[in-house]
Design a protein with these regions (language model features):
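N-terminal glycine/serine-rich phosphate-binding loop of ATP-dependent small-molecule kinases
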Residues: 1-76, 134, 203-211, 249
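Gly/Ser/Thr-rich active-site cleft segment
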Residues: 103-216
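Glycine-rich beta-strand-to-loop/alpha-helix junction loops that act as flexible
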Residues: 56-62, 191-193, 235-237
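Acidic-glycine-rich active-site phosphate/pyrophosphate-binding loop
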Residues: 10-13, 189-202, 243-255
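Short glycine/serine/threonine-rich phosphate/pyrophosphate-binding segments
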Residues: 60-61, 118, 217-220
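Glycine-rich phosphate-binding loop of actin/hexokinase-like ATP-binding domains
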Residues: 65-70, 74-93, 135, 139-170, ...
Length: 271
């Protein structure tokens, strides 16, 4: 919780459980994310009863996916970014895409791996057809939490790295490789855009919700990555080197984010 001058007023943090079922299967309970957001908001309100919250924004891990039914209930535990169950499907899809296509989409020959949403969609379609048939949306953690807070279905382009092109749009030719995939993805809006308000029955009801984006991009931005050609090193669950530059040199292992807010981030490695 920060004031309008950027001063830290209060903060909340809490661990939550990651279930490692096997080397390939790693999951989280998406309800844990939302319960802790509500706990944090309640704590902020109790500690700062006179506080008028102007806005709330979301940031989360990416390459973690929740399959939701038409009521917005999770059909499976969230498939965590470390989960590799879809490696066969990833290889199948990757073999259908040329390096020339990848460079035209992303500026670099980025492979489709087991953490890519298109790989996981194909895995669910093959291995859990009943779940696939019931799936209305496939969401990232921050988008799931925005949905639970506001009822709005939305995502942002940067959180969907590998699924959007340099124009910040979903790649039709990629999505067409898994029948039914395009209809199960949330619409995209800018990360700075208001996408809803907190529901009336929740703490700080009526507060504007700003879309936000992924953890690595926000972390590098907060470390000074908005400055042109400034090198950034971010250490945490992933070790990330990044630089903001308009120059593009396709390099295996380097992710080039689509330009957004006049920032074109090059980063790697990310896992």
């Amino acid at each position: 919780l920060v004031d309008t001058a950027g001063k830290l007023i209060s903060y909340f943090n809490s661990p939550y459980y990651t279930k490692t079922i096997s080397v390939e299967h790693v999951e989280q309970d998406p309800n844990d994310w939302f319960k802790l957001i509500l706990k944090g908001l309640t704590e902020f309100k109790n500690k700062n009863p006179s506080c008028q919250l102007s806005a709330l924004s979301m940031c989360s891990q990416v390459n973690t996916h929740v399959f939701l039914d038409e009521r917005g209930e999770a059909l499976l535990p969230a498939i965590f970014w470390q989960d590799t169950r879809a490696k066969v499907e990833a290889n199948e899809i990757d073999s259908k895409i040329s390096n020339e296509q990848k460079i035209s989409w992303w500026g670099t020959p980025m492979p489709i791996d087991a953490s890519h949403v298109i790989s996981r969609m194909l895995w669910v379609k093959k291995n859990k057809p009943d779940v696939w048939a019931k799936t209305k949306y496939v969401m990232l953690p921050k988008d799931y939490c925005i949905f639970k807070l506001s009822g709005e279905v939305v995502s942002d382009p940067l959180s969907n790295i590998g699924l959007v092109d340099n124009n910040l749009k979903y790649i039709d030719d990629l999505l067409s490789l898994v029948s039914g995939a395009p209809a199960k993805l949330p619409p995209l809006k800018k990360m700075t855009e208001q996408v809803g308000v907190i529901k009336k029955e929740l703490p700080f009801n009526g507060t504007k919700i700003i879309n936000g984006t992924m953890d690595a991009w926000i972390g590098i931005l907060g470390s000074g990555g908005f400055e042109n050609k400034k090198n950034i090193y971010l250490s945490g669950t992933s070790e990330i080197l990044g630089i903001n530059s308009k120059e593009v040199m396709p390099t295996p292992g380097i992710i080039i984010f689509p330009e957004d807010e006049n920032i074109k981030l090059h980063a790697g490695p990310t896992q």
